[in-house]
């Protein structure tokens, strides 16, 4: 079940080791409303297609072509791809480490979870929002938003990703270690 946990970022607290959430909700309408108040998009779609184990990117993109085209058109995104992570993926440790570091992008980060789950952590001013996205969730993180992503130590997800550029995922790391103070997906 999708979940939103809102924490103070701890920057004004003497004890930054164990933050206490200000709000925790698993109600989709409340998640959507809280994120929207902060400029983050959140939708839930029916993830009707069961992915065969051997489904490749072209199969995934074809299965969700109508939804992909709508988001691409509405957001002006130039390219789209699909990423599928499994517990035995050879780059899972390196990718998790990279994604766990706080960073920004020059473009929106838009993801639709076809299967599995991932934790988007958004550092917005004096708040940190941990947004657990699961199958059927679409999240739009605006360009320039400080955030990190946790796919877990044994990742098992597939997400469609939209981009404004042909290069794909390009991050600018902030150097802030804030992600180390907050719960992870595991």
Swiss-Prot record:
Q: What residues correspond to the site May play a role in transmitting local conformational changes?
A: 108
Its pathway, per UniProt, is: Amino-acid biosynthesis; L-methionine biosynthesis via salvage pathway; L-methionine from S-methyl-5-thio-alpha-D-ribose 1-phosphate: step 5/6
Q: Which reaction does it catalyse?
A: 1,2-dihydroxy-5-(methylsulfanyl)pent-1-en-3-one + O2 = 3-(methylsulfanyl)propanoate + CO + formate + 2 H(+); 1,2-dihydroxy-5-(methylsulfanyl)pent-1-en-3-one + O2 = 4-methylsulfanyl-2-oxobutanoate + formate + 2 H(+)
Which biological process annotations from GO are given for this protein? L-methionine salvage from methylthioadenosine; L-methionine salvage from S-adenosylmethionine
EC class, as a word, reads: oxidoreductase
The UniProt record gives the binding positions of Fe(2+) as 103, 105, 109, 147
Chain residues that bind Ni(2+): 103, 105, 109, 147
Could you list this entry's UniProt keywords, alphabetically sorted.
Answer: Amino-acid biosynthesis, Dioxygenase, Iron, Metal-binding, Methionine biosynthesis, Nickel, Oxidoreductase
Q: Where is this region: Disordered?
A: 1-21
Enzyme Commission numbers on file: 1.13.11.54, 1.13.11.53
Q: Where is this site: May play a role in metal incorporation in vivo?
A: 102
* Pfam families, per database record: ARD
Question: How and how many cofactors are bound, per the record note?
Answer: Binds 1 Fe(2+) cation per monomer. Binds 1 nickel ion per monomer.
- Cofactor(s) needed: Fe(2+); Ni(2+)
Recorded GO MF terms: acireductone dioxygenase (Ni2+-requiring) activity; acireductone dioxygenase [iron(II)-requiring] activity; iron ion binding; nickel cation binding
What residue spans carry the Polar residues bias annotation? 10-20
The feature of type site (Important to generate the dianion) is located at: 111
Q: What does this gene product do?
A: Catalyzes 2 different reactions between oxygen and the acireductone 1,2-dihydroxy-3-keto-5-methylthiopentene (DHK-MTPene) depending upon the metal bound in the active site. Fe-containing acireductone dioxygenase (Fe-ARD) produces formate and 2-keto-4-methylthiobutyrate (KMTB), the alpha-ketoacid precursor of methionine in the methionine recycle pathway. Ni-containing acireductone dioxygenase (Ni-ARD) produces methylthiopropionate, carbon monoxide and formate, and does not lie on the methionine recycle pathway.
Which family, according to UniProt? Answer: Belongs to the acireductone dioxygenase (ARD) family.
The UniProt subunit note reads as follows: Monomer.
Q: What is this protein called?
A: Acireductone dioxygenase
Q: Which gene encodes it?
A: mtnD
């Amino acid at each position: 079940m999708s979940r939103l946990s809102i924490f103070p970022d701890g920057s004004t607290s003497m004890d930054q080791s164990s933050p206490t959430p200000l709000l925790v909700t698993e109600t989709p309408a409340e998640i959507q409303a809280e994120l929207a108040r902060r400029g983050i998009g959140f939708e839930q779609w029916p993830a009707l297609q069961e992915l065969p184990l051997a489904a490749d990117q072209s199969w995934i993109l074809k299965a969700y072509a109508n939804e992909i085209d709508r988001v691409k058109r509405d957001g002006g995104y130039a390219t789209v791809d699909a990423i599928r992570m499994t517990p035995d993926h050879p780059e899972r440790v390196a990718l998790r480490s990279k994604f766990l570091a706080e960073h920004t992008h020059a473009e929106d980060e838009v993801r639709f979870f076809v299967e599995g789950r991932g934790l988007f952590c958004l550092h917005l001013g004096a708040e940190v929002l941990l947004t657990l996205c699961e199958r059927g969730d679409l999240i739009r993180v605006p360009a320039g938003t400080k955030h990190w992503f946790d796919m877990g130590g044994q990742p098992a997800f597939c997400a469609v990703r939209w981009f404004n550029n042909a290069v794909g995922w390009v991050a600018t790391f902030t150097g802030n270690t804030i992600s180390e103070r907050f719960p992870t997906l595991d």
